[in-house]
Amino acid sequence: MSEGDVARARAALAAFGTGDLDRLVRLFHPDFVGVVPPELSAEPDTYRGHAGIRRYVESFREYVDGLRFVPEDVIDAGDAVVVAMRIEGRGRGSGVPFEQRLANHITVRDGLIDSMTAYATIDEALAA
């Protein structure tokens, strides 16, 4: 990955928590595929295209206040970018804070995020 691709991955993760879906969607390829596996979510799913990005963010907003995606380590993994990160927020109804740590394996095509797959550990994401 180029430095520009690493910067795009950082920008995309930062944009998730801004609430600006139009800005976020512009960072993703129209053929984007995102995967959230069952071990990381009560509602695992595959998100496709710009509509998938919107659906993913809106599903969080329905239940979470103060949503933040916080990159902790960004690694140029050759043909991908791997980002160790945490997701933070508070339950909308309960106010209970939560934090989830994970690692994303991200690919870039034509200067846009093409795929993003979540893994439980950075080692799993690096091996993908």
Language-model regions, residue ranges each:
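C-terminal and inter-domain tail/linker signature
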Residues: 1-128
